[in-house]
Protein backbone atom coordinates (compact mmCIF):
# COMPACT_ATOMS: atom_id res chain seq x y z
CA UNK A 1 0.00 0.00 0.00
CA UNK A 2 1.24 3.48 -0.76
CA UNK A 3 2.30 5.67 -3.61
CA UNK A 4 4.96 4.97 -6.19
CA UNK A 5 6.18 7.61 -8.62
CA UNK A 6 8.60 7.51 -11.50
CA UNK A 7 9.18 9.19 -14.83
CA UNK A 8 9.01 7.74 -18.31
CA UNK A 9 10.98 9.39 -21.11
CA UNK A 10 9.80 9.18 -24.69
CA UNK A 11 12.05 9.39 -27.70
CA UNK A 12 11.22 9.69 -31.38
CA UNK A 13 14.65 8.85 -32.74
CA UNK A 14 17.68 6.80 -31.71
CA UNK A 15 19.97 8.92 -29.59
CA UNK A 16 17.27 11.32 -28.29
CA UNK A 17 18.38 12.80 -24.99
CA UNK A 18 16.49 12.46 -21.73
CA UNK A 19 15.10 15.79 -20.57
CA UNK A 20 12.10 17.58 -19.14
CA UNK A 21 10.62 18.14 -22.60
CA UNK A 22 10.13 14.40 -23.16
CA UNK A 23 9.38 13.40 -19.55
CA UNK A 24 6.06 11.90 -18.47
CA UNK A 25 5.65 11.64 -14.69
CA UNK A 26 3.75 8.48 -13.67
CA UNK A 27 2.29 7.76 -10.23
CA UNK A 28 0.38 4.78 -8.92
CA UNK A 29 -1.56 4.69 -5.66
CA UNK A 30 -2.13 1.28 -4.12
CA UNK A 31 -5.06 1.68 -1.75
CA UNK A 32 -5.53 -0.30 1.47
CA UNK A 33 -7.44 -3.59 1.25
CA UNK A 34 -10.56 -3.00 3.31
CA UNK A 35 -12.21 -6.34 2.46
CA UNK A 36 -10.97 -7.97 5.70
CA UNK A 37 -12.40 -5.30 8.00
CA UNK A 38 -14.41 -6.61 10.96
CA UNK A 39 -18.15 -5.94 11.29
CA UNK A 40 -17.49 -3.56 14.18
CA UNK A 41 -14.89 -1.63 12.15
CA UNK A 42 -17.16 -1.43 9.09
CA UNK A 43 -20.03 -0.09 11.22
CA UNK A 44 -17.76 2.40 13.05
CA UNK A 45 -15.32 3.64 10.41
CA UNK A 46 -12.97 6.60 10.60
CA UNK A 47 -14.11 9.58 8.52
CA UNK A 48 -11.74 12.24 7.23
CA UNK A 49 -12.90 15.84 6.93
CA UNK A 50 -10.68 18.58 5.50
CA UNK A 51 -11.29 22.30 6.02
CA UNK A 52 -10.30 22.83 2.35
CA UNK A 53 -9.45 20.67 -0.66
CA UNK A 54 -8.61 23.58 -2.98
CA UNK A 55 -6.10 26.26 -2.00
CA UNK A 56 -5.27 29.42 -3.91
CA UNK A 57 -2.11 31.48 -3.63
CA UNK A 58 -2.69 34.44 -5.96
CA UNK A 59 -0.23 37.20 -6.84
CA UNK A 60 2.94 35.76 -5.32
CA UNK A 61 6.18 37.66 -5.74
CA UNK A 62 8.82 35.70 -7.73
CA UNK A 63 10.83 34.51 -4.69
CA UNK A 64 8.05 34.60 -2.11
CA UNK A 65 7.07 31.74 0.21
CA UNK A 66 3.51 31.71 1.47
CA UNK A 67 1.68 29.22 3.68
CA UNK A 68 -1.88 28.16 4.42
CA UNK A 69 -3.18 25.66 6.95
CA UNK A 70 -5.68 22.88 6.29
CA UNK A 71 -7.43 21.35 9.29
CA UNK A 72 -7.86 17.58 9.16
CA UNK A 73 -10.54 16.14 11.46
CA UNK A 74 -11.61 12.59 12.18
CA UNK A 75 -15.41 12.82 12.39
CA UNK A 76 -15.72 9.02 12.50
CA UNK A 77 -15.91 6.48 15.30
CA UNK A 78 -12.50 4.80 15.10
CA UNK A 79 -8.89 6.03 14.69
CA UNK A 80 -8.07 7.65 11.34
CA UNK A 81 -4.67 6.83 9.86
CA UNK A 82 -3.02 8.98 7.22
CA UNK A 83 -0.94 6.12 5.90
CA UNK A 84 0.94 7.82 3.09
CA UNK A 85 1.31 11.25 1.54
CA UNK A 86 2.68 12.32 -1.83
CA UNK A 87 3.48 15.91 -2.78
CA UNK A 88 3.22 16.42 -6.54
CA UNK A 89 5.36 19.51 -7.00
CA UNK A 90 8.75 20.79 -5.96
CA UNK A 91 6.99 24.13 -5.36
CA UNK A 92 5.16 22.73 -2.32
CA UNK A 93 6.31 22.02 1.19
CA UNK A 94 4.01 20.13 3.58
CA UNK A 95 4.15 19.65 7.35
CA UNK A 96 1.65 17.35 9.04
CA UNK A 97 1.48 17.41 12.85
CA UNK A 98 -0.06 13.93 13.38
CA UNK A 99 -0.66 10.85 11.23
CA UNK A 100 -3.15 9.10 13.54
CA UNK A 101 -6.25 10.94 14.74
CA UNK A 102 -8.62 9.60 17.37
CA UNK A 103 -12.38 10.16 16.86
CA UNK A 104 -13.16 13.87 17.16
CA UNK A 105 -9.48 14.86 16.98
CA UNK A 106 -8.13 17.55 14.63
CA UNK A 107 -4.62 18.23 13.37
CA UNK A 108 -3.04 20.88 11.16
CA UNK A 109 -1.38 20.41 7.80
CA UNK A 110 0.73 23.42 6.80
CA UNK A 111 1.17 23.84 3.04
CA UNK A 112 3.85 26.25 1.82
CA UNK A 113 4.21 27.41 -1.78
CA UNK A 114 7.68 28.43 -2.94
CA UNK A 115 7.09 30.76 -5.87
CA UNK A 116 10.57 30.30 -7.37
CA UNK A 117 9.76 26.61 -8.07
CA UNK A 118 6.28 27.02 -9.56
CA UNK A 119 7.34 26.99 -13.21
CA UNK A 120 9.66 23.98 -12.84
CA UNK A 121 7.02 21.26 -13.02
CA UNK A 122 4.50 20.34 -15.70
CA UNK A 123 1.85 18.88 -13.41
CA UNK A 124 -0.49 20.91 -11.26
CA UNK A 125 0.62 21.20 -7.62
CA UNK A 126 -1.31 18.87 -5.32
CA UNK A 127 -1.05 16.70 -2.25
CA UNK A 128 -2.39 13.15 -2.24
CA UNK A 129 -3.14 11.35 1.03
CA UNK A 130 -3.88 7.65 1.51
CA UNK A 131 -6.12 6.97 4.54
CA UNK A 132 -7.99 4.13 6.19
CA UNK A 133 -11.32 5.95 5.68
CA UNK A 134 -13.32 3.44 3.59
CA UNK A 135 -15.25 6.20 1.79
CA UNK A 136 -12.16 8.35 1.15
CA UNK A 137 -9.13 6.04 0.95
CA UNK A 138 -7.49 8.61 -1.32
CA UNK A 139 -8.01 12.35 -0.90
CA UNK A 140 -6.38 15.20 -2.80
CA UNK A 141 -5.68 18.83 -1.91
CA UNK A 142 -5.25 20.89 -5.09
CA UNK A 143 -3.12 24.03 -5.05
CA UNK A 144 -3.28 26.94 -7.50
CA UNK A 145 -0.58 29.59 -7.42
CA UNK A 146 0.15 32.55 -9.64
CA UNK A 147 3.19 34.81 -9.77
CA UNK A 148 3.05 38.55 -10.32
CA UNK A 149 4.72 39.73 -13.50
CA UNK A 150 7.56 42.14 -12.81
Locations of regions flagged by a protein language model:
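Short, solvent-exposed loop/turn segments enriched in Ser/Thr/Gly
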Residues: 1-10, 21-23, 62-69, 116-128
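Long, low-complexity ectodomains and other extracytoplasmic segments of secretory-pathway proteins
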Residues: 11-71, 75-76, 134-150
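Short strand-edge motifs at loop-to-beta-strand transitions and within beta-strands
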Residues: 55, 105-111
Amino acid sequence: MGITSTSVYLSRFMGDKVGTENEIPVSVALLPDLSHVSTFESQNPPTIKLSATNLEFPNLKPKQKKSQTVLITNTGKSPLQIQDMQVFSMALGVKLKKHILQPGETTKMKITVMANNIGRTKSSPRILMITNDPKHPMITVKVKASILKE
